[in-house]
């Protein structure tokens, strides 16, 4: 398969089949497109840039309905810089650009959206398998250049790696694992204590569940997910990460409709969302995100958050989204319906950015941004009922 056909196949899978870049690449390549690991990595990075430039290509290709082969040819020939429209230059849909501009201004929107063009890798040191010091020495021996986060010492930001992250020995052996900083901050907001029972409402694939146990091994997690397949994968992952079997109870359920015999200490709702905050990880999101998808997830999150507040007086609600529809808007509805207090833990008050300023509670919720925190775009909130204060 020549490059035009290969790139066209990747675009087809992303746009028509609505799959991630990783899935599209695997389907197009089928392990036959290159001979060596180095060639595969180079081709993958080209596909990443191609998919990231999809909207830009649509803007500059003159045909009204260009084929995927037309777009692939244009990209190979370098025709990606002829449009003066800001959303075209940033290769995002016009509605998304206008929405972010209304929140951050044109300069802020451009800075954030450009920050998504390069992926930042974070590794979590898995102290269930080995002490932090040992894993750091192993990473250094592999030639990895990194920096340890000042507030969360088990999180390290990769500066330079001699090989793909997945091929580092500590990663292959689960003593370190790729996990974004924002994910770790979300779990830290729970402030899990000895003996706590924590419900993870949407638990798979299990990284946050495993981190809860890593931070407090005497805690117990009831982990719900709507997919039996994802739960099977999660069970295997928890075992590989060294999570004790008696620390986590997996349960298949739609969390909107669960009921418990008694309240639990805390709830983590890392809600299904548009993933608009993880464009750096999967640029296909720029090409396929729609207003309808955002609205669907916003409504679902409200249902899940209302149920979460039935289960506990302390709920941490997070989304990997840069849009207030999946964050501030949901919280605003909850504040009107219930008597909750929004709390940012003291250790994160100077670290977090506030929520979007048009909301009266913006200083009591947390936003993380790629251009400020070197993380995914995240919304994080902690809701407490008065009796829990």
What annotation goes with each model-predicted range?
Residues 1-389:
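S-adenosylmethionine
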């Amino acid at each position: 398969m020549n490059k035009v056909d290969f790139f066209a196949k990747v675009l087809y899978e992303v746009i028509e089949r609505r799959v991630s870049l990783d899935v599209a690449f695997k389907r197009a390549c089928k392990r036959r497109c290159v001979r060596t690991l180095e060639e595969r990595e180079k081709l993958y990075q080209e596909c990443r840039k191609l998919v990231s430039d999809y909207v830009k290509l649509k803007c500059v290709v003159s045909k009204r309905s260009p084929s995927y082969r037309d777009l692939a040819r244009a990209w190979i020939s370098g025709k990606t810089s002829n449009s003066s429209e800001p959303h075209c230059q940033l290769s995002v849909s016009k509605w998304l650009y206008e929405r972010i501009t209304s929140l951050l201004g044109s300069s802020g929107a451009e800075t954030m959206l450009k920050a998504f063009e390069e992926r930042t890798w974070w590794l979590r040191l898995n102290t269930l398998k080995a002490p932090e010091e040992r894993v750091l020495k192993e990473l250094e021996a592999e030639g990895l250049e990194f920096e340890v986060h000042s507030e969360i010492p088990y999180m390290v930001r990769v500066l330079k790696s001699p090989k793909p992250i997945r091929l580092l020995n500590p990663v292959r052996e689960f003593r370190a694992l790729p996990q974004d900083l924002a994910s770790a901050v979300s779990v830290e907001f729970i402030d899990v204590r000895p003996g706590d029972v924590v419900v993870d409402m949407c638990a798979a694939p299990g990284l946050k569940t495993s981190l809860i146990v890593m931070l407090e091994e005497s805690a117990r997690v009831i982990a719900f997910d709507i997919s039996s397949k994802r739960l099977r994968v999660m069970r295997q992952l928890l075992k590989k990460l060294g999570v004790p079997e008696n620390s986590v109870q997996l349960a298949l359920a739609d969390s909107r409709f669960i009921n418990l015999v008694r309240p639990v200490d805390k709830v983590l709702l890392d809600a299904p969302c548009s993933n608009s905050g993880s464009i750096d990880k999967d640029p296909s999101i720029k090409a396929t995100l729609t207003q309808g998808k955002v609205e669907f997830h916003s409504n679902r999150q409200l249902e899940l958050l209302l149920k979460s507040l039935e289960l506990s007086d302390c709920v941490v609600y997070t989304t990997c989204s840069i849009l207030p529809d999946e964050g501030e808007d949901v919280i605003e509805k909850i504040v009107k319906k219930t008597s909750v207090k929004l709390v940012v833990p003291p250790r994160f008050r100077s670290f977090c950015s506030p929520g979007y300023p048009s909301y009266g509670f913006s200083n009591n919720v947390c936003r993380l941004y790629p251009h400020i925190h070197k993380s995914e775009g995240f919304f994080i909130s902690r809701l407490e009922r008065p009796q829990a204060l």
